[in-house]
Every structure is written in C-alpha cells, then in structure tokens.
Regions:
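A conserved SF2-helicase RecA2
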Residues: 537-546, 550-620
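Inter-lobe coupling linker of SF2 helicases/translocases
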Residues: 230-247, 266-280, 284, 303-405, ...
Length: 620
C-alpha cells in the first residue's frame, strides 16, 4: 500500500524495498523527481514550496503508477483537508473581490461602518467611488488599484490607512515609488490628515542621508516615530534588510507606479518580492497595468501573492509573452477579483476640452533635411524618429553623435538598443544645418506660450530634449517671461521648490519633460493649459503628463486645454507629419485603454516596433 500524507509538506510512504525500487525507476526520474525534496527513513518528502495544484498532480501520477503496480494508493484525510482548505480559501478570496467590486448589498452595512471610521479620521473626505476603492483594498489586504492617473489613488490608500490606524493599530505607511512622487505623497498626507495627524516623514533620499549606511541607520533608528517612509525603487536593494524589519502588522506597504517593476526576475522585482513577502497589507498602484504586454503583470502578481501565484493564476512567462485569445480571457477572468479600477468620469472630473492641434508648415530647408534623414535612416526607424525630433527642435543637434540607448524613454517597452550614430554628413549638409534658422515649430511654440502668458494663464510646456527646454527658457526669458526648468539633472529639493513657486504664481511657465515630471505631481489647482512641443508614442508618459493638470479636485466647469504642435513636411508623396502620425497613434492607444476599462478587461498595448511601423507607414 502507498500512502500520501501531509504534515506541513506532502509525503509518500511505502515499503522500503518498493521505495528503493521506485527511486531508480523511470517513473520517478521522468515524473516525480521534479517535485521531490528528499528520500529518507522510508519516506519520500516533497518540496515545501509546492502548491495544492502540484499536490493534485502528484496524486494523479501516483494513482496511475499504483494501478500499474497493482497496489492501493491511500490519500490521507489531512492531505485531503489541506487541499480542500486551500481551494476554499482562494475561492472565498476571489468571491470577496468580486462581491466588493459589484457592491453586493450584503456588504453595505460593513461599507457604511468603514466609511464612518474613515471620514472621522480624515480632514479631507473621499468621494463615494474612492471610498469603495479604499474599502476594497482594505478588505482584500493584498490587492492592486489600476485606476487611471489623476483619479485619486493616493487618497484612497490614505483612507485605508485611516481605518487601519483606528481599528488595527497601524502606525505607518512605507511607500516605494519614483523620487518625483515623494512630494505628492507628503502633500496628500498633509492635506488628508490636517489637524488630525501631523506628517512625520522619513525620506531616505533627503540631503542628510548621503550614503547607503546612513540610510540604513535612519531606517533602523529614526523610522519608529515616522508615519510615512519614502524609498525609491533603485534604493530598495541597498536598504532591504532594514526595510524588512519594518514589515510588522502596523505597517502598510505601498508600491506606487508599480509598472516600473518591469523586467521579470530583475533587481527591482526581486527586491520588491522579498520586501512584500512578510507584509500583512500590500497595495500596488498604477494607472497603466499593462503598458506593453501581459508579462507586465507577472511581477505585480508575484509581489502581491508570492505564495499563491501558482494556485491563483499559474500563467507561465511564455504563455504571457505570446498569449492566445483563450489565455487573455483566462488572465482577465483570474485577475478581475484582485484589482479595482476607477475612471475620472466616475469621479465627476470635468472633461477636458477637445485638443487644439496647431499645424506648422516646414520651411524649404526643413523639407530638404527631412529627405536627407529619410534616405540615411530608412533602415533604422528609431534613429529616424529621434533625428526628426532633433530637426524640429534644433537642427544643429543633427551634428551630434547619437546613442540610441539614451532615448529608450521614448519607447513604451524595454526593447534594448545600443546603436550609436556618429552623424557623418557631407559638407553640403553640414552647411545647410549650420545656416538653418530657428525651426518653424520652435518659433510657433514660443509665440503660443507668450500669448497664453499675456492672458495671465500659467503654462506647462512639455519637451523631450533637455536642449529644447534650455533653449526655450532662454527665448522666453528674453521676452520677460518668468520660467523655470525641471529635468533629470535638477536635484529633487530644487524641483520641489520650483513646483511650489509655480503653484504660488511666482513662475509663469514650467518647462519640463514627461520622463522626469509625468508621475504623481498635482498642478491642476493653478494650471489649465499645457503645450506639447515634442512628444513620443510612449502612452504612459502622455497620459501621466496630461493628468498633471486634469485630475480629481477640479471644480465643475473648469476647462483643461492641451495644445499639440505639429510640423508638416512636403514629401514626394504629399504632406506628412511625424507629430501627426505619433499623435494619431497615441489617440488610438488611448482609445484601446479606455475601451478596455469599459469592458472590464486589461488592455495590451502595441510594441515599439509596431508603433514605428505605423508611424512611418506614410513616409516609406
């Protein structure tokens, strides 16, 4: 008789001579060995990390082999009970998520009690939809919030904290997020708990913590009195041991902009997984859960459910990388109960005005340079994209060497590229570039910005290149316009001061780029006009940049206006605009995302290669 049992892990017991024969059999080598941990004292013990699904597979395998050996297989009551309990646990968890999202009437009384507790503990009240999202995250303990950028995800998390502070002695939030989101978390905490709980923040990137050891020491000795601890993704690995010591029952762990954790089994993913493993409450926030492919959810789900992933989901990396329609349907069905997602429309944010697209005709010189670039880079569309953007900003940039790896932020995915272009143009072309005046598009942007400023409207101008930002600052400054720049080289403390000055009215124009300032910065209280001088097909950056001025908190009737500058060239095949092609692509990707939200599924966005093929479809 063979006996399968459970005593903390699965075991197989059989007579010693049969066990010895089994251990050298082809059945063991081909079927069981991958699951086995050790064989000793007449017992085969299976790996402790196996899931109940693995146990069911082992039972089926052993049943077939027992029949072949004409012996009885007994599955113990303890093993059956463990499997049944796991199935029931996951079923209950999944059912609760669905009931919360459907606002099941039987949960109404508990929701109202939750709402009363949260409202009593917050100075700034949550909207009804935000309160349901907060209730969902609290009840699920580990979940994701995929609400669109600008829909108040941070406040919903703070509502969860307010409830747990009152009911479960929670005393701090640890937030892992990009540095440029630190200010938003501090501002939101201060606003939500004004007069109730003062902000006591530990920012491990503050100037006084210059070394890794100083940061680790701060977490060990200064964190106890803090209610908000801020760490960026890059720094987690260096202070992981100190952070893990904080993961007690009084800590809420938040991963904000969790789409930053892209690469499967990469450093960010492994650190996040380790940190989340012992946390009781974990929330993952992102407005763009699947920016590129379904593989993007692999890390997210492992962070939230490290021990349950195989049982709850079980999707392999190859399966997520190239999903069939059936796989996509299965992923969405399995994932639905574990995330909430709210649109700005549901929260009553007034709709933005229709985009104002401003067409600018290219000069003869610009048309000639486009033809040269078209011939030179027809086999490298990313290089062509970057070079045309440079032409439209400052043609002199075409004479500089180009390392395409420096422009990966233009992409929506993590495609690797290391090609370097050394810009070996002929003397004739160099002369053409040297004698080129300011680009037509640049002049139109300065004109539009000045017009809006003269109407007493604060303005954000979005660029891609730091060179564009600096030249635009010089041009606007020469016209007496007060402007400041925010890009990667600007220290975090200086960025925060610039943003505060902009909000206070000391700055008329803010010049920046999406990969520096697109995330988690709120400027909607003072600014309602944004100009896009340069833009790429990175939908994440576009949506997040738009939401700096269009987000929860806008009063009814408040306008929001976006301006897109588009330079139009004359080619042999007629008029063509890179800006126009990119803009159309972005609108299509945004439509796909919003349609997916309406249909309650997670969207998959095109790859960068597909984007480039579409954008240059009208040029080649």
């Amino acid at each position: 008789m063979w006996t399968l049992d459970y005593d903390g892990s699965m075991t197989l017991r059989l007579p010693s001579e049969e066990l010895e024969a089994l251990s050298i059999s082809s059945f063991y080598k081909l079927s069981l060995k991958r699951y086995a941990a050790e064989i000793a004292d007449g017992i085969m013990r299976f790996k402790p990390a196996l899931t109940y699904l693995d146990y069911k597979k082992i039972i089926a395998l052993c049943q077939k082999e027992a029949v072949r050996h004409q012996t009885e297989l007994v599955v113990s009551e303890s093993l059956r009970a463990y499997i049944d309990n796991r199935e029931l646990h996951l079923e209950i968890r999944s059912r609760l998520g669905s009931e919360l999202k459907d606002r099941d009437p039987k949960l109404r009384e508990r929701f109202e009690a939750y709402r009363d507790t949260v409202n009593a503990g917050m100075a700034r009240k949550l909207r009804e939809q935000q309160m349901w999202d907060s209730f969902f995250m609290c009840a699920m303990k580990k979940s994701a919030n995929f609400s669109v950028p600008g829909s108040g995800k941070t406040a919903s998390v703070l509502g969860m904290y307010a409830y747990l502070r009152e009911k479960a002695a929670m005393h701090r939030i640890v937030v892992v997020c990009p540095k440029n989101a630190f200010g938003s978390w501090m501002d939101e905490f201060t606003a939500c708990f004004a007069g109730i709980e003062p902000l006591r923040v530990l920012n491990i990137h503050a100037p006084q913590y210059k070394t890794q050891q100083q940061r680790r020491t701060a977490l060990q000795y200064d964190a106890g009195g803090c209610n908000l601890i801020l760490v960026n993704y890059e720094a987690v690995g260096g202070v992981l041991d100190a952070l893990e010591q904080l993961m007690d029952t009084g800590t809420l762990l938040v991963f904000d902009e969790v789409h930053k954790v892209k690469r499967i089994r990469g450093e960010y993913a492994e650190n996040a997984l380790q940190l989340a493993r012992n946390a009781r409450y974990v929330v993952a926030l992102t407005g763009t859960p699947i920016p590129n492919a379904y593989t993007d959810i692999y890390n997210l789900l492992h962070i939230l459910f490290p021990d349950e992933y195989d049982e709850c989901f079980g999707f392999t990396v190859p399966q997520l990388r190239n999903p069939r329609d059936a796989d996509i349907a299965a992923v969405n069905t399995a994932l639905q109960p574990f995330f909430c997602r709210t649109t700005k429309e549901q929260l009553g944010v007034p709709a933005a005005n229709a985009d104002m697209v401003l067409q600018v005709g290219a000069s003869d010189t610009e048309n000639r340079l486009l033809r040269i670039l078209q011939m030179k880079y027809r086999k490298n569309k990313l290089a062509l994209l970057v070079r045309i953007l440079q032409l439209e900003s400052d043609p002199r940039m075409l004479l500089q060497a180009l390392d395409l790896n420096d422009f990966r932020y233009l992409l929506d995915d993590t495609a690797e590229t290391s090609e370097i272009d050394y810009a070996d143009y002929s003397d004739e072309v160099r002369s053409l570039i040297d004698n080129c005046e300011e680009s037509s598009k640049f002049c139109r942007c300065i004109e539009l910005t000045e017009k809006l400023v003269r109407q007493n409207k604060p303005v954000i101008v979005w660029c891609m290149f730091v060179g564009s930002i600096r030249r635009m600052a010089d041009a606007l400054g020469a016209r007496g316009i007060r402007c400041r720049c925010v890009f990667g080289e600007v220290p975090l403390e200086e960025r925060q001061q610039i943003l505060n000055d902009f909000r206070a009215g000391g700055i008329q124009v803010l010049l920046t780029n999406p990969h520096t300032l697109a995330e988690s910065v709120s400027l909607h209280s003072v600014c309602h006009d944004a100009i896009y001088f340069e833009y790429s097909y990175n939908l994440v950056h576009l949506l997040q940049s738009k939401d700096r001025i269009h987000r929860l908190g806008l009063p009814e009737g408040q306008y929001t206006q976006y301006y897109y500058l588009q330079l139009t060239y004359q080619t042999e095949d007629g008029a063509w605009s890179l800006d126009g092609a990119v803009y159309d692509r972005l609108r299509e990707k945004e439509r796909i995302m919003l349609e997916a939200i309406d249909c309650h599924r997670l969207e998959r966005m095109p790859t960068s290669e597909e984007d480039l093929d579409t954008i240059f479809g009208g040029l080649f």
